[in-house]
Amino acid sequence: MQDQYILALDQGTTSSRAMLFDRQGNIVSIAQKEFEQIYPQPGWVEHDPQEIWSTQAGVAAEAVTRTGLNGTSIAAIGITNQRETTIVWDRETGQPVYNAIVWQDRRTADFCDSLKKQGLEAKVRAKTGLPIDSYFSATKIRWILDNVPGARDKARQGKLAFGTVDSWLVWNFTKHELHVTDVTNASRTMLFNIHTREWDSELLELLDIPRSMLPEVKASSEIYGHTKTTVFASKIPLAGIAGDQHAALFGQMCTTSGMVKNTYGTGCFLMMNTGDKPIESKNNLVTTIAWQIGDDVQYALEGSIFIAGAVVQWLRDGVGLIKTAAEIEALAASVPHTDGVYLVPAFAGLGAPHWNARARGSVFGVTRGTSAAHLARAALDAIAYQSLDVLAAMEADSGISIGELRVDGGASANDLLMQFQADLLGVDAVRPQITETTALGAAYLAGLAIGYWKNLDEVRDQWQLDRRFAPSMPKEQVEQRMAGWQRAVRAAKAWADDTQ
């Protein structure tokens, strides 16, 4: 197996990416292609499933050929993907019956409210670890069955297949032979019992979704099958699947209970490994399966923040405060603090642990002396404050004191933000050398399945530090800042509450 590589496919919300990794976990090649976002109505977000497939197949081939390699150089393929996004297709023709309904899509919000009014939230959470929300796949499937002509009849006849993006890619890579998913993607559908690790008959009945539509659920690291497409002439093992945040947790080597990662992207996704037992959240977090390797299943607590790096994009595109996103660090660093200014970026409501859909973006504490630099600093600080809210909820739910925070994603390159995050948290923020942790996690899962890497210890040893940010702010100062933030969040919620 000399000079073989692992190909990681990272199918994201705005682009399809492919990366080749060598035995040391280094990136050898990378290819990326963006695709169209479709907005048919306000609050609706769709993708073309055929474009998801064509862009992903295209970058897979490009990542391999641009290094002068071919399919025989690929030891295995690992897949990681945007989660919850829902595709339903005809088993006979292989054609989607409707566009992919993306995780951000809110069209089923009213239906979710009606399920909550029936008192079903506790039951759904107990079985799936998830709240009832249009974010997850179940109500999106139901919408397609109810609204696409002929879909329900075909589904009853066993002619339709449902899959999250991983299933759709495997189906196409195997020329319509394999209809599978892994436990992490299944655990985001609101149809999967995370305790029995099976599709839940009661929930399927409740939502009137035929079981015949659903993929077979597998571990996150095993040989599912081999490629049969013209993308690669050789048959390559498809050997790893995990949803993007789960793959990032694995790529960060958060493999023991209590380890936490934060991916700083457009939003923030925080995940804590809670070991082999699911913890039901009392603090508005989501309980999910982290991954499964062999018979070993790890669980996690997760909190999502809607607006993180997006607040910087807003300052650039919406307000014109900066010309490029990279400018924000220098501008924010030109003042020692925000001078009492707080920015609550609730542009789309507040995510975990607040889950307030009606809160709106607000700026507090503005005086005549407030400058562009203060606003820039308040925007960065808001990312760290929101992350701390989620981390505090994780500590409360798990009873575990966080020892360090492993960070990745685009905004983790911002040293000022990482330092403030460490200051607030009171523990080190730790940035790895390879911040492409999502793709790396998928590569590791695939490589472990075929013996490319011997065991978990071997890949754990590859994790390398780029920089460790140690807390340096006095405790009283942290408490004072946090009190101001909490006041600002309360005010942002009150603004949206028209009963006050």
UniProtKB/Swiss-Prot annotation:
Pathway(s) it belongs to: Polyol metabolism; glycerol degradation via glycerol kinase pathway; sn-glycerol 3-phosphate from glycerol: step 1/1
Q: Which CDD domains match?
A: FGGY_EcGK_like
Anything known on activity regulation? Inhibited by fructose 1,6-bisphosphate (FBP).
What is the similarity comment for this entry?
Belongs to the FGGY kinase family.
What is the protein named?
A: Glycerol kinase
Per the UniProt record, the source organism is: Burkholderia cenocepacia (strain HI2424)
List of residues binding ADP: T13, R17, T266, G309, G410, N414
In which residues is ATP bound?
A: T13, T14, S15, T266, G309, Q313, G410
Q: Which SUPFAM superfamilies match?
A: Actin-like ATPase domain
Q: Which UniProt keywords apply?
A: ATP-binding, Glycerol metabolism, Kinase, Nucleotide-binding, Transferase
- Function according to Swiss-Prot or TrEMBL: Key enzyme in the regulation of glycerol uptake and metabolism. Catalyzes the phosphorylation of glycerol to yield sn-glycerol 3-phosphate.
